From Swiss-Prot:
One Pfam assignment: Ribosomal_L17
Protein source organism: Pseudoalteromonas translucida (strain TAC 125)
Hydrolase keyword on record: no
One of the record's GO cellular component terms: cytosolic large ribosomal subunit
Protein name: Large ribosomal subunit protein bL17
Keywords: Ribonucleoprotein, Ribosomal protein
Gene: rplQ
Keyword Ribosomal protein attached: yes
Gene Ontology molecular function: any one: structural constituent of ribosome
One GO-annotated biological process of the protein: translation
Stated family: Belongs to the bacterial ribosomal protein bL17 family.
Amino acid sequence: MRHRKSGRQLNRNSSHRKAMFSNMAGSLVKHEIIKTTLPKAKELRRVIEPLITLAKTDSVANRRLAFARTRDNEVVGKLFSEIGPRNADRPGGYTRILKCGFRTGDNAPMAYIELVGRPATSEAVQEDAQSAE
């Protein structure tokens, strides 16, 4: 029986899952939007939200905790210098999941997961303008 067991297994063992979500969290912090399957996006939300909450108060101890979870100094730096202060007044809900259809090949439901307060890049604005014409 699997009563009160939280989290998705995603057909991986625990070390693979931990490494995958560590890498995905780092990618999300670097790029601020990533495309993945819907179940992975929903699970990633459980990993990244506490990291951003941790980044709201900058201290050596919090930086070490974030590094222990991501293993990337560049990610920790961006987390504490940009993303944490940007969400200082937001009480949770730092990510948004947008469904984007199904993957060709295996028909897996796909989704974009993005950070809520992310600035619109000039490249994305230019692409939207070109596609609208």
